[in-house]
Amino acid sequence: MRPTSGITLGGRYQLTDRIAIGGMGEVWKARDKVLGRITAVKILKEEYTGDPNFLRRFRAEAQHTALLNHPGVANVYDYGEEKGSAYLVMELVPGQPLSSILEKEKVLSPERTLRIIAQTAAALSAAHAQGLVHRDVKPGNLMITPTGRVKVTDFGIARLADQVPLTATGQVMGTAQYLAPEQATGQQATGSSDLYSLGIIGYEALAGHRPFTGESQIAIALAQVNDTPPPLPDTVPAPVRALIMCMLSKDPRERPSDAAALSDAADALRRKDTRGAVEAVPALAAFLEEQGVADPSGAETAPLDYDGMRTTHPRAEGTRADGSPATAALPVTTAQPRTDDAARGTGAAGAAAACAAAAFGATASARTRDHEIAAVRDQQTRPG
């Protein structure tokens, strides 16, 4: 059945206007004739309804999202299959995707970026608490309401940590531009993988571009594994730069320990409370040193001017009085650079190539994947 305006699904959901077309389906605005409310209906494309794998994945999206009850996640109301079509009835979220905002505005302020990170991480924390990993966190899946609230959408490729994945062994679901290194090397995605993807979003919002680019999905996936992110602009306050680089660690153990901690750290930096951010994410201390800010527990501090975007931190002439509140800024020191993350993940080129080829759920043949893997290995071993 091809969706058109006026069609009623399940005897109840009358389609009115098409909102968007995605890779797997269409999203329509609809009126619930029973409850009288306006909803969003996601309808699986006809070419996929006959594919058992796609149908299972679509059902899984309904089941996964229905597990969650959080203001930062778009609610699922119903699911049905009718006349060869499968549909998912969801909360209609007003606003626009972050991808559209970034396309128009290019760069967001540190405060606005931190707010998006904090709210998204809080929603992901609710998903992770249910054992649910999103696996495709990207700007297009973050709806921003007119009041600035974030709603995480599209759990279509999410995976419960204790269930067998629907994808084939060695195949990756996700978008290469936001793919965590462990996903790009064929390892199982975890909650930390979602935080890495959110770090890419934060970088893009602050810099106006993504940290890794390439001529193909394979090249971008390899960059996620092997390359160090370019420094963020100096106009971004050092503690904010440090948080983003912490999220973009190649080693998941160097990222924030969980989404709730990340949300707390981002909120702390919004309050200009660097010490509070380090208490939430202890791993952040090493990245602060890398940005020229050291000793989060030290007594000597100078205020951080977020409004003026001052990123140099002259040492305060005196120390804080006993009992005074912790400030957001920290003294300057000459930091020793940490070991380059690019050294990590070597030897994973073949897996990264296979993952990039399989992005968006593509089902490349074994012969094609072998050819791609060989090409990437040849590229890495070629002199010069």
Question: How would you label these PLM feature ranges?
Answer:
Residues 1-306, 311:
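Eukaryotic protein kinase
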